[in-house]
Amino acid sequence: MSQVQSGILPEHCRAAIWIEANVKGEVDALRAASKTFADKLATFEAKFPDAHLGAVVAFGNNTWRALSGGVGAEELKDFPGYGKGLAPTTQFDVLIHILSLRHDVNFSVAQAAMEAFGDCIEVKEEIHGFRWVEERDLSGFVDGTENPAGEETRREVAVIKDGVDAGGSYVFVQRWEHNLKQLNRMSVHDQEMVIGRTKEANEEIDGDERPETSHLTRVDLKEDGKGLKIVRQSLPYGTASGTHGLYFCAYCARLHNIEQQLLSMFGDTDGKRDAMLRFTKPVTGGYYFAPSLDKLMAL
């Protein structure tokens, strides 16, 4: 069985760092850099076992095609953007995702990543996420309630089972900027109708009582009676005085599941848009492929 990269399956991490970058020059330098980083990561994982450290190196479409010789990751493509610009694309070449129970350890690993990749990449965005009170989003609503729980269930959803991509996963990242002043102008009832869950108790509002535009309705999708599940590794980010919001991060064995949720949220299926857009907006978006650790080490 191919070994999964260690940042895909962990639950309830308290902190994360996401680094998106473009390749400088030829992609061949990424091969040695990826292996060097994986070796450094293993050292940190052994040194800080209680941190439950994990990390992922993933690649955008053009970069993965160049690294793999065009083999595998058949669903992978550049993030096209959705909703006629409501969900913009900021596709980059490389994603590094680091997560654990300790921000200090994450930061040390991020420094190691910068040493490993060096001049072969140009960092375009670096975001530090944190777990907020009761695993709530900064909106005050619990985030990720329907996230698959347990390693085997999460593996079933997030990891490709067999074939040339066995042990790999598709990744989607999208940074949302919240306008909490706008949110707080709404009554709690109106906020709950936007999300589709009660705010304090985190109870699902019945489908016939919540609007078709509620967030829950837009993303709770089924095909042939089966839910289109994803594994979320999202966290709040930002500063109290400035920009803040949610860094959305999802892993799935099928890019299809992620894309169907996006099409539904941004009105590309039935013209109805997620009511969350009343108080928050996405400002980035990228699709990536995370190969198995075995394949990453053998690039």
Curated annotation (Swiss-Prot):
UniProt entry tagged with the keyword NADP: no
Q: Where is the active site?
A: 143 (proton acceptor)
Pfam families named in the record: Dyp_perox_C, Dyp_perox_N
Q: Does the keyword Lipoprotein apply?
A: no
Q: What NCBIfam families has UniProt attached to this entry? A: Dyp_perox_fam (TIGR01413)
Give the UniProt family note.
Belongs to the DyP-type peroxidase family.
- The protein's name is Dye-decolorizing peroxidase YfeX
